[in-house]
UniProtKB/Swiss-Prot annotation:
GO terms for biological process: cell differentiation; chaperone-mediated protein folding; muscle organ development. Keywords: Acetylation, Chaperone, Cytoplasm, Developmental protein, Differentiation, Myogenesis, Nucleus, Repeat, TPR repeat. One of its GO terms (molecular function) is Hsp90 protein binding. Residues 1-25 are annotated as: Disordered. The keyword Nucleus applies. This is Protein unc-45 homolog A. SMART domains: TPR (SM00028). It comes from Mus musculus. InterPro entries: ARM-like, ARM-type_fold, TPR-like_helical_dom_sf, TPR_rpt, UCS_central_dom. One of its GO terms (cellular component) is cytosol. Detected in spleen, bone marrow, lung and ovary, and at lower levels in testis, kidney, heart and brain (at protein level). Ubiquitous. Detected in uterus, large intestine, kidney, spleen, lung, brain, liver and ovary. May act as co-chaperone for HSP90 (Potential). Prevents the stimulation of HSP90AB1 ATPase activity by AHSA1. Positive factor in promoting PGR function in the cell. May be necessary for proper folding of myosin (Potential). Necessary for normal cell proliferation. Necessary for normal myotube formation and myosin accumulation during muscle cell development. May play a role in erythropoiesis in stroma cells in the spleen.
Length: 944
């Protein structure tokens, strides 16, 4: 009896649409056998929608359960099997599949009940009996572990509750043990059931840092991926109490509370899903209400007096992660709309606060940037003009209120808020800047005697210069003011910001060599001053950041790039600043590096279009002579020598909302430029570039992920993957590489991904299974038909290595496909490398699946000519592959051996067998020995 595959019910003529439903079932069964479980699932779903009898529905539901089991979506597998059981309580296959799903979900007690029913229905079924024994053993092991865990938890609780313990050392040790114990599900459950949450609440109330950290980390274990325990924990501690811990002065405690709140949010948001632990918990009536309470508490924390700046930043970080949709495919953005209505003004209040100013909220140097990122993500999450208009209206009302009704202090806050918007949702910032009197106030305050007012105004002017239209206006009206500030101010903080404003205006033409805002040589002077300030250790990091901002703009000019990479001290200062606590510098550093490596997108203009544009007297961008490939390669080598990879690796590790997806994209572009030359890849790997590329390839913008994946492919092609990505890290490389196989990627990216996957597939079976699990095989097969010979060859080589896996061999052995035919035909192509790959795959498949040997003569009438051509090839590798295929075919069937011996193959093998000792000679001799064994030929008198 088979319990894992799909079944086909008999169609009933009386059922409307029975023939089409039956066709869909058959299609689903074939797709299931071929390993296309998603396709099979779709076919079964369509068959269900046509309307069927309860018996047929039960079979289709259990077929869907089989698909979900293969796809490792165990919650859905359980649901489908349960539907089948509802329609037929004695459906033993559905019961068995549900038991498999329940086992994977950790619900062993329920899985045992289903298996016992299976055994009672079919007592002689050995599969059921063996499964029941296995689960019984798992339950006994869990009971033993729980017994030992009980004793550990009890002992630690006694120490923590003992009033006689005067010192805290024992208590701290016990609390740390609780943290370790809570990482295991059994331990977390025991702590929870032993009134552990109440005890941990008492530890939080001690306000001792070590005990608070231990309590928070233990709570992480209790709440992690467990919705019911999370809700129970919140009911004991109170959501507002947990959120309030974010605001403490101690940075470590605030970060621990931030981690706990992230875990709580994940548990509430996702609920019971695939792979979650402890599904026997309580049912939650309305998790959405708990989510809103949590988010509302975070919004209130933003504007509470007495909250630390670090706590405010952590609250913003959580809101950035929690609120916006993860994917635009998700149609529900109601949480974003609710946050905008309830908390937009609170976010703007943080963004408009001045650091270290009297009467202002306590903020850090990173607070405004974090607020900008949150505002940007909220704005990007809006779906229609009406929602965006509401966002604009709320921002404008807030700014207008401060600008018009609170005197000079109100104007400063309004302008600071505009700067925050310009750094985030710039459309909203530009609209706010156009409000009556705002731009005039910015210009006027630039001439103020007070440093605080000048700082706010100059920064707003810098951010306003981002748009070409506004840059032209400021060039005409504000350059003289910025120059006066740069030359006349006695404060470095003002001078450096004025310099950045000039840099930004000077780079308004971008990489266009023909468009220069300032006179020749002016940008070089500005860049020199930026480098001077950057290298000055006496200036604080927050001020030096502006020097990097200036260089980020000026490095559009190739002359500036050349001077910058020659200045070793400036490069080292840049890399040192990127490692500092001044996180807001990351984007500027990334921008400068992208400019120096020319890793932005650039397409060579069509010469005909250029001529047409000149004829029409339209402006045609010109490339700087020093942006040619030879100059770019030289700059890349200088950056590598200066240690750019180590600096970028540290930037990737940054756990801050400032490391936005756009910033990740910049780093991905630079990494791709660094690994362009083969001789540079060893340096990148040695300095940790391979490790840094993995998170960039898995998270970020689509462009950034693709660039990082391509860089990973280049490293995998030319370096030993096991050394480049040691340990478990090598398995994380597969998914980014498979993503490069999509049709949206370029031909070069497809080719490099195929070559990299070929290398990985040749390492181990586990890696091959990972490639199969990522559904790469259908895409690789598609590229085997590609017209481009290099892509076709790479795909064939990849399939050759994958053919060592049983699942791929099953695909070739399945009836009704041309996979084997394609390999046979490719073995006779003119492209020698393609022939080598195809013949290698053919040799491997015929060795592992002898049944395929009898099908080779059936797939094409030219099979004999192709084999003879392989045997006669001057290439030893092709000869060896050909002789192995012939040997496998002869070993599989006497009839095929007879056909081969009746052809010229016999004469060719006789010649090959007499050659010098080699794999070809041995294989040819083995073929002749098999022919003698079959009595198809006679040995000569010498016994040869």
């Amino acid at each position: 009896m088979t319990v894992s595959g799909p079944e086909t019910p008999e169609p009933r003529p009386s059922d409307p649409g029975a023939s089409s439903a039956e066709q869909l079932r058959k299609e689903g069964n074939e797709l299931f056998k071929c390993g296309d479980y998603e396709g099979a699932l779709t076919a079964y779903t369509q068959a269900l929608s046509l309307g069927a009898t309860p018996q047929d529905q039960a079979i289709l539901h259990r077929n869907r359960a089989a698909c979900h089991l293969k796809l490792e979506d165990y919650s859905k597998a359980e649901s489908e099997a349960s539907k089948a059981i509802e329609k037929d309580g004695g459906d033993v296959k559905a019961l068995y599949r549900r038991s498999q799903a329940l086992e994977k979900l950790g619900r062993l007690d329920q899985a045992v009940l289903d298996l016992k029913r299976c055994v009672s229905l079919e007592p002689k079924n050995k599969v059921f009996q063996e499964s029941l024994r296995n689960i019984g053993g798992q339950i006994q092991e869990k009971v033993r572990y729980m017994s030992s865990t009980d004793a550990k938890v009890e002992q630690m609780f006694q120490i923590l509750l003992d009033p006689k313990e005067k010192g805290t050392e024992k208590k701290q040790k016990a609390s740390q043990n609780l943290v370790v114990l809570a990482r295991e599900d059994a331990g977390a459950e025991k702590i929870f059931r032993s009134n552990g949450v109440q005890l941990l609440q008492r530890l939080l109330d001690t306000e001792e840092t070590d005990l608070m950290l231990a309590a928070l980390r233990t709570l992480v274990g209790i709440c992690s991926e467990h919705q019911s325990r999370t809700v129970a924990t919140l009911s004991v501690l109170g959501t507002r109490r947990v959120v309030s811990i974010l605001g403490v002065e101690n940075q470590a405690v605030s970060l621990a509370a931030c981690h706990l709140l992230q875990v709580i949010f994940d548990a509430l948001k996702e609920g019971v899903k695939k792979g979650f632990r402890g599904k026997e918990g309580a049912i939650i009536v309305d998790p959405a209400r708990e989510l809103k309470v949590l988010i509302n508490s975070l919004l209130e924390l933003l504007t509470e007096v007495g909250v630390s700046g670090q706590g405010r930043d952590n609250a913003l970080t959580l809101l950035i992660k929690m609120v916006p949709r993860k994917s635009p495919k998700d149609p529900n953005n109601s949480l974003t709309l609710w946050v905008i209505d309830q908390g937009l003004k609170k976010i703007l209040e943080v963004g408009g606060s001045l650091q270290d100013a009297a009467g202002e909220l306590t903020v850090t140097a990173n607070s405004r940037m974090s607020a900008s990122i949150l505002l940007s993500k909220l704005f990007d999450d809006l779906k229609c003009d009406a929602e965006r208009e509401n966002f604009h209206r709320l921002c404008e009302n807030y700014i207008r209120n401060w600008f018009e009704g609170h005197g000079l202090a109100g104007k400063l806050r309004a302008i600071q808020t505009v700067s925050c918007l310009l750094q985030g949702p710039c459309d909203a910032g530009n609209r706010a800047l156009e409000l009556s009197g705002v731009m005039e106030s910015v210009i006027a305050l630039c001439a103020s005697e007070r440093e605080e007012e000048q700082l706010v105004a100059v920064e707003a002017l810098i951010h306003a210069a981002g748009k070409a239209k506004r840059a032209s206006f400021i060039t005409a009206n504000g350059v003289s003011l910025l120059k006066d500030l740069y030359k006349g101010s006695e404060r470095d903080s003002i001078r450096i910001r004025a310099l950045v404003g000039l840099c930004k205006l000077g780079s308004a033409g971008g990489t266009d060599f023909s468009m220069k805002q300032f006179a020749e040589g002016s940008t070089l002077k500005l860049a020199k001053q930026c480098r001077k300030w950057l290298c000055n250790d006496q200036i604080d990091a927050g001020t030096r950041r502006w020097a990097v901002e200036g260089l980020a703009y000026l490095t559009f000019d190739a002359d500036v790039k050349e001077e910058f990479v020659e200045d070793e001290a400036a490069l080292k200062a840049l890399f040192q600043l990127s490692r500092s606590e001044e996180r807001s510098v990351l984007f500027a550093v990334g921008s400068a590096l992208v400019n120096c490596t020319n890793s932005y997108d650039y397409e060579e203009p069509d010469p005909k279009m250029v001529e047409l544009a000149k004829y029409a007297k339209q402006h045609v961008p010109e490339q700087h002579p020093k942006d040619k490939p030879s100059f770019v390669r030289a700059r890349v080598k200088k950056l590598l020598a200066a240690g750019v990879v180590s600096a970028m690796t540290c930037m990737v590790k940054t756990e801050s909302p400032v490391l936005t997806n756009s910033c990740r994209e910049l780093l991905s572009r630079v990494f791709l430029a660094l690994v362009e030359e083969v001789e540079d890849r060893g340096t990148v790997v040695a300095q940790g570039g391979g490790k840094a590329l993995l998170p960039l390839a898995l998270e970020g913008t689509d462009v950034g992920q693709t660039k990082a994946a391509q860089a990973l492919a280049k490293l995998t092609i030319t370096s030993n993957p096991e050394m480049t990505f040691p340990g478990e890290r090598i398995y994380e490389v597969v998914r980014p590489l498979v993503s490069l196989l999509h049709l949206s990627c370029s031909g070069l990216q497809n080719f490099e991904a195929l070559m990299a996957l070929t290398n990985l597939a040749g390492i181990s079976e586990r890696l091959r299974q990972k490639i199969l699990k990522e559904k790469a095989v259908p895409m690789i097969e598609g590229y085997m038909f590609e017209e481009h010979e290099m892509i076709r060859r790479a795909a064939t080589e990849c399939m050759c290595n994958l053919a060592m896996s049983k699942e791929v061999q099953d695909l070739f052995e399945a009836q009704g496909n041309d996979r084997l035919k394609l390999l046979v035909l490719y073995s006779g192509e003119d492209d020698e490398l393609l022939r080598r790959a195809a013949a290698g795959g053919l040799a491997m498949l015929t060795s592992m699946r002898p049944a395929l040997c009898s099908r080779i003569p059936q797939v094409t009438t030219h099979w004999l000519e192709i084999l003879q051509a392989l045997l006669l090839s001057p290439n030893q590798e092709l000869q060896h592959r050909g002789t192995v295929v012939v040997l496998n075919m002869m070993q599989s069937s006497k009839e095929i051996a007879g056909t081969l011996m009746e052809s010229e193959v016999l004469e060719i093998l006789s010649v090959l067998a007499k050659g010098e000792e080699s794999p070809v000679t041995r294989a040819a001799a083995a073929c002749l020995e098999k022919a003698v064994e079959y009595r198809l030929i006679q040995p000569n008198q010498d016994g040869e």
